[in-house]
Amino acid sequence: MRYSITSRFHGALLGATIAEKITNPSKSKSTAIAKLLIPGAQSLVELGRFERQSWLKKLLILELTPLQAVVATLPLALFYHDNKINLRSNLLSVASIWQYEPVIQASILAIGYAIAQALTEKLYPTTLIPQIVSFIDAPNTELTDALQQVQTLLEQKAGIEKNIIAKGSITTSVALAFYYFLSTVEDINLSVKRSIQSPFTSSEIVGALSGAYNSAANIPSSWQIVADSQISPKAEMLQLSEDLVAVWSGVYDSKAQLLSTAVAAPRVIRSR
């Protein structure tokens, strides 16, 4: 593997959290996005699987905005990244709350699928969006139309905001997040900084996508310093991401405090 699965889990969660802090440096240390990510991750670790009622109770998801709901499903995408059937089923279980708002359901599926492809090292910028449209399996939704526009603009190396901002708010946020991520896919620093300059997208989603793809190893050291000094739940999120990997791989011991876990692919034994 290009990067360890643990580093990619770290990258996704830290990327989202640090992007939020860079976007809103005046916010308190206890970041809003951490409050979205930690409860769902804790539920998965405690139960060893996704249970809808536990998830909804911990997150109070009906009180979330559509974009917050998309971000809150990131732990699910991490946990079920290697099984697309379970991934889709569990994401839809959460998304079904908005059964009359297909763009929210499509957004949850789109981000979840992209995270999964990054973690399995099957994310290719030129083919990701067509694969997402197929995974959503609901043609002619507002989001799939916008994503297809993004695909065309990426192929043409064209600017994007003037072509996308006429759409609804969550459609705009998700479509632009994919544009900023895919147009500079190997550079988390540039992807996030470009997204911050746009009032129409979510830099947190860009940070999660790029963090999963590039791993924590490629998060700039200056950002890590910001995280160490200004984000109070960083250590908790890192521990939770390690626990998520351990539960996913079947080596988690709920009676032991895991300080550092070496994890290989399932059914493969490797030294630390």
Predicted regions: what is each one?
Residues 1-272:
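Structured, active/binding-site neighborhoods that engage oxygen-rich ligands
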